[in-house]
């Protein structure tokens, strides 16, 4: 009898060890090694972005390439050398001598010519190249602003998701503590099993919320690490204040619009594209004027006289082709771009107004009164589990308050995120950091 009892206990111990081993292996299978935490303030992240982002590096090379074309546009065409001489005569190759009278024998002809561009074509081509540099610079600023906006969005989103994760973790600890107390009450017969199961269901629901939050966190982390050119198992933890100031600078809509006209990258690209097309029209008109080729030539045995030196001038006669088609095409390109530029100006004004109004709405929602409400609500929540354990509130009241608290906390974190993103939307459209 003693032997059977001992064997039974040993079997149970082995089963427990096996289950523990399987649980450990399962956890190892579905978990990654602990990530290294990189704590960054926003300005630190922005500096890393400016120093290491590969898309910005590619755009910088594009600017340098355009600057090189300005230098090339200034260059004169190389002079042209044209030569002719006799190859074979009287049984001799390259015979260059004089006869008995001292007259040269054999042909030697050489001509050097230089193309002279008229109507200021070289200057107009240089102006086009300079405008192209300005376009490349604004394209660089556009890429930088777009990536910077994505950086800010990911950075602040991670901060919000981290706040959710902290809140979920605190709630899970409270629920697990409550679950442990309920197990004792259930075993003692003091509560119904349905109350215990309701708390378990709440724990499972919270686990799903934590999983969804972690997935969103991974997506934002991946985008942010790509922008910052960070690889490996690194977790970026944004260092941001818990609250966001609702104070806004005293600026008018017209001041914002005027600033946007000077700094908005999309609008400025259309402005410089119009300048480029206008300069191209001037160049096409200049191309209708013929260029002149000047040169000097020497002929050792010319028909006119030995050792002939002459002046050569050549130019095309513009009888039929006056570059009419290209001029007309360039003219309509200017008209087209004027319409595009004007449309971009209308869109810019509406975008500035829309972004600023959204900021005002969001800041109004983040008022001090709401802040006091959140503070009072969270203070009440700290005592809710204890109140339920002491039977001061029912299970239904506890569940309702618990779900409401979680929703309210998420709304507060979302509101802070919305205020930060609304500020950055205004800054992004205006083109400078006018809202701090």
Question: How would you name each of these model-derived features?
Answer:
Residues 28-38, 71, 82-118, 125, ...:
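Small/polar, glycine/serine/threonine/aspartate-rich low-complexity segments that form flexible
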Residues 26-80, 85, 232-275, 345, ...:
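Bacterial Sec-pathway N-terminal export signals of envelope proteins
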Residues 2-8, 25-35, 413-436:
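Acidic, low-complexity, intrinsically disordered peripheral segments
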Residues 47-57, 64-79, 110-127, 138-145, ...:
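A glycine-/polar-enriched beta->alpha junction
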Residues 58-73, 143, 147-168, 177, ...:
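Amphipathic alpha-helical coiled-coil segments
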Residues 2-3, 8-9, 40, 143-259, ...:
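Periplasmic alpha-helical coiled-coil/stalk elements that build and connect Gram-negative outer-membrane
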Residues 127-130, 193-202, 395-403:
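Short, charged, amphipathic alpha-helical segments
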Residues 11-22:
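Bacterial N-terminal signal peptides
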């Amino acid at each position: 009898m003693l032997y059977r009892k001992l064997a039974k206990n040993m079997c149970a111990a082995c089963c427990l060890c096996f289950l523990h081993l399987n649980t450990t292996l399962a956890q190892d299978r579905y978990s990654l090694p602990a990530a290294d935490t990189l704590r960054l303030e926003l300005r630190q992240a922005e500096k890393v972005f400016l120093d290491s982002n590969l898309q910005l590096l590619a755009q910088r090379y594009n600017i340098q390439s355009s600057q090189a074309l300005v230098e090339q546009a200034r260059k004169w065409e190389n002079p042209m050398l044209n030569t002719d001489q006799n190859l074979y005569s009287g049984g001799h190759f390259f015979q260059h001598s004089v006869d008995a009278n001292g007259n040269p024998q054999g042909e030697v002809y050489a001509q050097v010519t230089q193309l002279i561009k008229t109507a200021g074509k070289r200057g107009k081509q240089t102006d086009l190249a300079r405008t192209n540099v300005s376009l490349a610079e604004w394209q660089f600023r556009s890429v930088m602003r777009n990536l910077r906006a994505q950086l800010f969005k990911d950075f602040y989103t991670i901060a919000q998701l981290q706040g959710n994760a902290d809140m979920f973790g605190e709630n899970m600890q409270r629920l697990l503590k409550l679950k442990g107390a309920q197990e004792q009450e259930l075993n003692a017969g003091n509560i119904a099993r349905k109350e215990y199961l309701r708390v378990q269901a709440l724990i499972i629901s919270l686990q799903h919320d934590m999983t969804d939050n972690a997935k969103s966190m991974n997506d934002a982390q991946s985008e942010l690490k790509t922008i910052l050119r960070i690889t490996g198992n690194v977790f970026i933890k944004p260092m941001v204040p818990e609250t966001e100031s609702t104070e806004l600078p005293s600026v008018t809509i017209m001041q914002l619009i005027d600033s946007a006209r000077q700094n908005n990258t999309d609008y400025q690209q259309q402005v410089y594209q119009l300048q480029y097309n206008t300069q191209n029209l001037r160049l096409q008109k200049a191309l209708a004027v013929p260029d002149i080729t000047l040169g000097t030539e020497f002929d050792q045995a010319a028909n006119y006289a030995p050792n002939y030196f002459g002046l050569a001038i050549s130019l095309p006669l513009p009888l039929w082709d006056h570059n009419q088609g290209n001029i007309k095409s360039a003219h309509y390109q200017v008209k087209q771009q004027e319409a595009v530029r004007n449309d971009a100006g209308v869109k810019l004004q509406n975008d500035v107004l829309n972004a600023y109004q959204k900021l005002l709405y969001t800041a109004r929602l983040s008022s001090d009164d709401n802040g006091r409400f959140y503070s009072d609500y969270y203070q009440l929540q700290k005592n809710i589990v204890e109140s339920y354990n002491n039977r001061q509130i029912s299970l239904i009241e506890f569940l309702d308050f618990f779900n409401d608290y979680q929703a309210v906390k998420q709304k507060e974190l979302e509101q802070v995120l919305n205020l930060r993103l609304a500020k950055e939307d205004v800054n992004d459209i205006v083109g400078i950091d006018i809202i701090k």
